[in-house]
């Protein structure tokens, strides 16, 4: 999604932090005089070099191996792109470096946004996507933005959708278990063990967000929160939007909903079966019960309450993708 927001406006210098494969910076090289990619994971560097050569941008793009701004000295940039590690991970979990955002998910993100003051030019812009835990009202990230940047930066944050912190923790439990190469049923034990962590961080939801920050003159900052999230309950009735206007394609690991030849959503098999049952009459709970009667294996790894909650959260994502709406 971050690459979709790379504009065609010509700029001098672009920075891609937490570069990963380097895709953001490589795409930005088409409109920039120079691009710097920063990546801390040494194992990723050969892949970045390959992608640079593959796209014939080696004359514009340089790689710096290190942590965030540390290799950059006092360099400043016109644009900064970041897809950072943002997953909130309780202490003691063995979790992939690519996703581990610390106990509240903001360890890396706070360092990134605080660096905008030093490394972003006046009228320069920074873009970030990710997930952030928060209260029922908003993610904790917004409070950090207010404290750190709101006086001298024009901030726009779009909240796409939100899902329960419990669902986030269960998903993270399975990732952590995979890292430890333990039995799959241990994920349930780990999930129960870390329910206390949910209370400690005082989080209710996980928010998916898109952030744009523009450096202004001193004292001319502002913050705008665009909340597109909607909470679905078991009693809501989903309705398909222009169901004849899209196609479903099957891939080895997932299904894709396409409209006008463009993928607008990726689905697992359970969500696809759920969508096919939407008739504009049944509630989410009724669809779940209908699916259970037809297929005993449908989301059977979750208790009923959590399974319905998972489908409700899927409805929030499908609503953002303009696939369904509430009756």
List each model region and its residues.
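Conserved SAM/SAH cofactor-binding pocket of Class I
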Residues: 1-73, 79-82, 88-89, 133
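Short amphipathic alpha-helical segments
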Residues: 49-50, 92-95, 113, 139-142
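A generic alpha-to-beta junction signature in SAM-dependent methyltransferases
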Residues: 72, 119-120, 278
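Rossmann-like AdoMet/SAM-dependent catalytic core
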Residues: 153-273
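A mobile, often basic/glycine-rich helix-loop segment
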Residues: 92-111
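Conserved Class I SAM-dependent methyltransferase catalytic core
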Residues: 41, 106-161
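Long, charge-rich, low-complexity alpha-helical segments
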Residues: 34, 263-327
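Residue-level signal for inorganic ion chemistry
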Residues: 2, 83, 112, 287
